Amino acid sequence: MSTIPNDLKYTKSHEWIRLEADGTLTVGVTDHAQAALGDVVFLELPEAGRVVSAGEACAVIESVKAASDIYAPVAGEVIARNDSVTDAPESVNADAYAAWLFKLKPANAGDTSALLDAAGYATEIAD
Amino acid sequence: MNAPARRTPLYSCHLAAQARLVDFAGWEMPVNYGSQIEEHHAVRRHAGMFDVSHMLALDLTGPDATAWLRRLLANDVAKLRTAGKALYACMLNPTGGVIDDLIVYRLSDNQYRIVVNAGTADKDVQWMRRQIGEMPANVTLTPRRDLAMIAVQGPHAREASWKAFPELRAGSESLPPFSGAQLGDYFVGRTGYTGEDGFEIAVPADKAEAAWAQLLAAGVQPCGLGARDTLRLEAGMNLYGQDMDESTSPLDTGLGWTIDLKDEQRDFVGKTALLAAPATRQVLGLVLEDKGVLRAHMAVFTPDGEGETTSGTFSPTLQRAIAFARLPPGVAAGDTVEVDVRGKRLKARCVKLPFVRNGKALV
């Protein structure tokens, strides 16, 4: 069974999002996604300063098996990326919720209300 | 409607080992049992085992067996002078395309064992039966779905196999590479698909679970199709359906060495077409110098024109992306080329295959 922490938000495309106290978002891929991908061997993350729209493919995660896009959960500006995870891609498999990928400053704070909660994401991946 | 997935006699062993199962050529097969990379390293460093029961063993017997195989296959079974020797060969269609690649063991004068790919097995049997009728040949072809096959591979694979089956030691200790022997209930072939030493062991289906359990107890790591793919890529071995198929000449896919033209009197299916169409491509390995992962069907740009990757992956042994590429004839090992990786041109170095052999990086 995949872990789906209650204190995070989710997208249908398998990103997890932590809403930080300062209004910024921390983004990663879910435990369900890392298990499906298998051994992660390469990540390409967006640079700080890049402006992204909601649903835009802005990062790439590659496992031994296949390459997958990672999508911006909401519109905004990338304010940080996790270089330690690109140096150790296997950390995504070890703990998908500790291995954050990038941080985002949302263009509109209200946009996050459309994200799934843990129960909604659990339903999404139940099939 | 798709037919329901077929299961090998080892299916319950896979469930017990918590395999992640996927559809492979209509078979429900393990892709990994946790980490594909750990399974890969187990084969390079110690010993791993693969359920290859989805592949099909066929027994061929009869007075015309040798003559018929010399016509069926582009490689020449006349090379198999002693019982037990094995040969890798392509079975071609009349236009020189590859129907399948297979291994044939000579068991005795008029008796052979052929092992073909899972995805092509039904097509292969139909083709072979047609060829028996066309010759016509006095041979009997018997598909052996009553057998399960386990490939045990790695530097310690043989020792681990003897630990699991002590009764096999005496009969298989002096078995040279690329040969096999029937030892009681077991057919043991010293062949493989990983670039490592090891045995491919065929057992009656009702003994398969016990054999798997004995190998497990001897410390052999179960490995899935995922590791099988990264291992065979490192070992420079083609995968049917990906690196070659019925539309490709073996000459264009790095398999020219399996075409035996020494006996000019020998005619084989596809020979005329091959002689009329010399190779237009060569196959080299690519090692990605930039960061990223190579996959199949990426465009390769060289000073001599464009090429294409046919298989690509991340190599756990080299810790770099590698690929097979079909390239214009002028390109040579050592040259640097560019590969279109998801819209970016990344630098790759051309190398001779294989990338890895017997646990050692060769590039």
UniProtKB/Swiss-Prot annotation, chain A:
Binds 1 lipoyl cofactor covalently. Its cofactor is (R)-lipoate. The modification N6-lipoyllysine is found at residue 65. InterPro entries: 2-oxoA_DH_lipoyl-BS, Biotin_lipoyl, GCV_H, GCV_H/Fam206, GCV_H_sub, Single_hybrid_motif. Keywords: Lipoyl. It comes from the Bacteria. HAMAP family: GcvH (MF_00272). The glycine cleavage system catalyzes the degradation of glycine. The H protein shuttles the methylamine group of glycine from the P protein to the T protein. This is Glycine cleavage system H protein. It comes from Azoarcus sp. (strain BH72).
